[in-house]
Structures are given as C-alpha cells and as structure tokens.
C-alpha cells in the first residue's frame, strides 16, 4: 500500500489546519465583541436579605473551625484545609484591629488629667512637664490681675505709655 492509500480522503493538510483555526477565530471574534459589554464582576440578581447574609457570614468561621478541629477526615483535600485557614485568618484580623483601637482609646482617655472636685489629680501616664501647665496658667492669671489695678498712664510691668517701636527713638517722647 502506498502512502496515498493510508491518508484519509477528503481533507488535505492545509484544509485541516484551516478548519481547526476557523472555530478558534470565530470564538475570539465573539469574545472581542462582548468584551465591551462586560465591565465588572457579575452580580447575582437574587441577593440575600441583610439578616440572612449576616447569619451566613457568622456561620462560615464556625464551620471552618469545626472542620479544622476534626482530624478524622483524611479524605478532605489539602486545598479545602488551606481555604479554611485563610478564611479563619481573614475573620480574625478585624477582631485584632478592634482590640488595638480599643487599647488606643483607653490610653488616650486615661492620659488626660482627671478632675475630682476642686483638686487636680494627674494620671501617671501624663508626661511630667505637662503637670506644670496648671501652675504656669495660675502665674499668668496672677500677673494679669496685678496689671489690671495699675492705670494705663502709670508704668506697669516694665512698659511705659510711649515706648519706642522697632528700635527707633523719637526725640519728642524722651
């Protein structure tokens, strides 16, 4: 038998390549036409009510925890175990973040001075120099009260009525 007899009658090598490329080209053309219409992830038209969605999100960590705790499931795939571990990490991260936020709020709240009645009780978290602020304020208020009693013409606190500005001296005021 010759080689020509072993060949399938009907399609030559060029025709066979063109026949297999034709569906591929038509598929690519179809995808190119539809690419502009798809601009995001598909959204399910049947959304769950918020209560059921919250319940589902609460059940996921419980199911993963029970799945990972049971060692009697050797037939479970490694990929499924990894998925459960990733989900458990995702659900634990927001809890850790809220714990950090609560600690920051606690420290900020108790770093302020606490006033009980007439006495000022300063927390030990406050910087020692910040404890001097009330004393400085009291000194300034005393100085202000002393300056009130002195008249505007009389020298008070080292200032006089017509003082030179910007280093300039006026002969009429000396």
UniProtKB/Swiss-Prot annotation:
Q: Which residues form the propeptide?
A: 38-105, 170-174
Q: Which UniProt keywords apply?
A: Amidation, Cleavage on pair of basic residues, Neuropeptide, Oxidation, Secreted, Signal
Q: Which residues carry this modification: Methionine sulfoxide?
A: 141
Record's keyword annotation contains ATP-binding: no
The domain of life is: Eukaryota
A single Gene Ontology biological process assigned to it is: eating behavior
**Pfam families named in the record:** NMU (PF02070)
Q: Where, per the database record, does this protein carry Asparagine amide?
A: 166
List the InterPro entries hit by this protein, alphabetically: Neuromedin-U_amidation-site (IPR018070), NMU (IPR042384), NMU_C (IPR008200)
Q: List the disulfide bonds.
A: none
Tissues of expression: Expressed throughout the gastrointestinal tract with highest levels in the duodenum and jejunum. Low levels in spinal cord, hypothalamus, and stomach. Neuromedin-U-23: Expressed in the small intestine and the pituitary gland (at protein level). Neuromedin precursor-related peptides: Expressed in pituitary gland and small intestine (at protein level).
RNA-binding recorded as keyword: no
Which GO terms of the molecular function aspect are on file? neuromedin U receptor binding; type 1 neuromedin U receptor binding; type 2 neuromedin U receptor binding
Signal sequence range: 1-37
Mention any one GO cellular component term assigned to this protein in its UniProt record: extracellular region
Similarity-based family: Belongs to the NmU family.
Protein name per Swiss-Prot or TrEMBL: Neuromedin-U
Q: What species is this protein from? A: Rattus norvegicus
Q: Which gene encodes it?
A: Nmu
